[in-house]
From Swiss-Prot:
NCBIfam families to which the protein is assigned, alphabetical: PRK05035.1 (NF003454), rnfC (TIGR01945)
Name of protein: Ion-translocating oxidoreductase complex subunit C
Enzyme class: translocase
Annotated organism of origin: Salmonella typhimurium (strain LT2 / SGSC1412 / ATCC 700720)
Binding site for [4Fe-4S] cluster 1: C377, C380, C383, C426
Keyword Metal-binding: yes
Enzyme Commission number(s): 7.-.-.-
Any one of the GO BP annotations: electron transport chain
The protein's required cofactors: [4Fe-4S] cluster
Any one cellular-component term (Gene Ontology): plasma membrane
Amino acid sequence: MLKLFSAFRKDKIWDFDGGIHPPEMKTQSNGTPLRQVPLAPRFVIPLKQHIGAEGELCVSVGDRVLRGQALTRGRGRMLPVHAPTSGTVIAIAPHSTAHPSALAELSVIIDADGEDRWIEREGWSDYRAHSREALIERIHQYGVAGLGGAGFPTGVKLQGGGDKITTLIINAAECEPYITADDRLMQDCAAQIVEGIRILAHILQPREVLIGIEDNKPQAISMLRAVLADAHDISLRVIPTKYPSGGAKQLTRILTGKQVPHGGRSSDIGVLMQNVGTAYAVKRAVIDGEPITERVVTLTGEAVSRPGNVWARLGTPVRHLLNDAGFCPSADQMVIMGGPLMGFTLPWLDVPVVKITNCLLAPSVTEMGAPQEEKSCIRCSACADACPADLLPQQLYWFSKGQQHDKATAHHIADCIECGACAWVCPSNIPLVQYFRQEKAEINAIRLEEKRAAEAKARFEARQARLEREKAARLARHKSAAVQPAAKDQDAIAAALARVKEKQAQATQPVVIQAGSQPDNSAVIAAREARKAQARAKQAAHPMADSAIPGDDPSKAAVEAAIARAKARKQEQQAGSEPAEPVDPRKAAVEAAIARAKARKQEQQAGSEPVEAVDPRKAAVEAAIARAKARKQEQQTGSEPAEAVDPRKAAVEAAIARAKARKQEQQTGSEPAEPIDPRKAAVEAAIARAKARKQEQQAGSEPAEPADPRKAAVAAAIARVQAKKAAQQQVVNED
């Protein structure tokens, strides 16, 4: 009795909520053995036939390839694809693939040569001699992916399982109507499938291995039982026929009673699941050394005359397979890739067969029925009762239609397995699965964009951190590379700084002056006397050199005299703006007479002595001083009324003065005179005038009268005569 209860517990199965029982329609194709299809003349191999990124190309246009030769390199989740036959690569270009929207993907197009030659194959018959990692790498490089419909890379799935897998489940349920590919494969290749299961068990080392198969496959069940008759490491579980019992979460629930959490995976509860077709592909990759180049495809539907299951090479056009099955299309004929519930209609028949293609359904018009019009949801909740994932399809429908992505995510739309049970039972004929697929695609696109933004932000922050680190390192290098002065240099610098500080301290000390004391200037006085003595000695040593220096150019002297006259004229104009008082001619005549008397007396006194040359500079200075004194006297006497000026007398006196000056020049012209520098004379005259002007400004506090123009004219005439005399003397000396 105890053994009976143990056996009962061992073979116990559970049930899942929801599910439907549609017509199976499997007998059309599962009654005939697997057969080979003639090679197509051209193959189109998409680079991406799995979940993940496409691999890196390793062939070029014009290359000749063999069957099983890798067309791409697989790294990470990039699964390689292989040539399905021998031939020549004629193009590498985008081509429409097996997708509901017939998207174009990069593909390698090969023209078959008809020889179908293999690459050199190396099998591992004793696979237990190889490590777990080597087996996983071989499975990955030979292009094995999930053949049940998901297309997830098998090597990546095995690597992710690690040591936490306790139960390995082989999915042989094949619950969708019309599809019999796994059923026929188990009938014809049961031993190879079991061998592949043992390879997977060797890699994962689980505690138990379970095969789940529906009870509507009696021939396959009998074949597996025959192979497993003496095996105790693998258990075969027959489950009731119910759609979708072949789903990963649903089959896990049926065989183990465990529930996969929302948003989780079966590996989270220690379960890993593989398809029977995948197990067969693993056996061929490891033991036979053959990459996956073909798979079993069901050709069924009332539009084909020879339904059945065939070995279809990957990349074979759908049209070629249907024509081999006797395809008789009708008007508005549809062809579905996959089953009637989870498949999609092909837009045209030139798309190729890929790794996830398990069925090509060509129904007649009466078989599928006419398409019905979509109506409004009546909130009947039939979809919720049929959902095997315990979701609320009617709510997800409204969220998807209203673009409410957050609410759809909160209601676990990601857990939808797109089985189509909700759409099957919907009385309003609403294509719920299409809405859910579109909503999930939009959510994935939003998440991908957010991920890219986060990665860009992380790259920016990493770059900023790197720049900061480089800046800090650069500053540290600069500081460490700075030249440090040696000890000797430091001593010299310290001594120099001490001297500077001492001088600064001395400069800042206050000077103390004692009353009654005199400064000691003896050194300065001695230096001045020495310079004077040196100058006198130098002058005595060269007495003749100085006298022999000829005068400057008379033309320059004339120019400078003209400049002096212009300045005097400008000064007269500036002074002419103020009204001038009348000049007293009597005073002017008296002063002119006094000047003549003084000059005559000086000539008489100097008559006995040789006449020296007249120094025009002294004369100009004396004339300026005389004019200043006269001006001052006029200002002092300006309060008295002046008599009327007789212009005739003034003119006579000026003429007499000019005649006397000319006579004096003639008397002194016979003796040689020292050369006179007219420029110096003009400069000294200008200095004298400036001094006189300054004296006038200082005396400007009292009201001043305008200067006597006659005196100025007389002085200017005398200056001109003296300049002319100097020029004549210069000419005589040159001769």
